[in-house]
Amino acid sequence: MTGLLSILLHYKGNGDLATTDIPSHEKIPSAKRTAVQFCIGPTHEQSPRMSTVSQGRVTFAVLPTKPKDEVTSMKANGSRQSSCIVSNARKRQSVHCLSRSPIPSTRLKENDSRLCSPLASPTGGLKRPAKVSFALANTPSRKGNLVPQSPRRTIATTCKGVLEDVLKKDNELKFNDSDEEDEVDDEEIESFNSFSRKMQTISNSRYRGSPKPNIEKQSCSSESDRVSQISDDEEDEEGSADEEDEEDSDVELSESSLSDDEDSPLRCPSTPVQTAAAPNESQIPDDTDFVPGTFDEDQPACLAFACSLTHANSKRSIMLPQDIDPTFPDSEPEDDGHASSTVGSLSKEEARFKAKAKWNYKSSFSAHVSSEVLRNSKSPPLDIARKAVGAHRV
């Protein structure tokens, strides 16, 4: 950058430059100068171990707009020279940056942003030089100076990548756990197996049933004779059985004894006897607490129901007086004769009233009261208000 800035500062409008390294055949009159393209390249005398890249020969080309023949010729010559110069400069600069930078990744990014900037092409005729990857541009003499970079771990940004990372971690943990499990001592496994066998034998012996006599063999003598006539060959075969067969037979005997105990009639019957318990007060509905005629809410439901029954029976047994008309034709003949004898002397209404009075005392009392009221109705009414006022004054 220092070389580029110096060129821009020393450039003048009349076409003169401070540097005098311009060959004669490249000079163009100032009337045709419209733009300047330049780049920095090392000289042939410069050694590859120079401390700075800016030391070198500056070459530039003036690109005219007219005529077209000159422009095309300048494009062809300038593209070849610029591509060669730029490629050599970038290679030198990349090697120099890699050798001097302690952290190559940061320095390379800065140099890449500077060197990868395209050359100023106002007419757009020159070709852009090919890109050079600085990480791979290593000379054989500088291999030892490069710092080995550790491979960066990519961070998953999608759901699929995250799931793959999680599954990888789980697989690693599973492999580690399986390795630790394989390191368990065989002695512990054998002790566990022996303990389980002992517990199994103890359980089989604990639930082994007592031998029961066979009733059929005792009743039938023929069967007992058959049992006594067993051949000696069969006894030898039974004696030569292995321990495993004996254990299997013991297990079968214990199972058969358990099944016999379940089928025996001495045990509890298959169908249990269901005895219905007496209902509690909480199980009886609340409607029975309010029996008609009883208002005792604290009384139990059963007693309340009994009281309601006795109350209903007592109502049926009580005889209540009824209004019976003796003049009705269904009455007794004595009453009819008595009524017929008195009809001539008394009027029909009086006779009927007297007959009713015998059977219903309420009607007679009401009639007597009504008659007395009629008699006293002719007397003037008392002035109660005046009497009360006079008593108050006295």
From Swiss-Prot:
Pfam families linked to this entry: DUF2457
Ranges of biased composition (kind: Acidic residues): 178-190, 231-263, 284-295
Ranges of biased composition (kind: Polar residues): 191-207, 216-230, 370-379
Principal subcellular localization: nucleus
GO cellular component, as recorded: nucleus
Phosphoprotein recorded as keyword: yes
Keywords, in A-Z order: Nucleus, Phosphoprotein
Signal peptide: none
Residue positions, PTM Phosphoserine: S117, S121, S379
InterPro entries reported for this sequence: DUF2457
Region (Disordered): 177-295, 315-347, 370-394
Subcellular location: Nucleus
Protein name: Uncharacterized protein C1259.08
Source species: Schizosaccharomyces pombe (strain 972 / ATCC 24843)
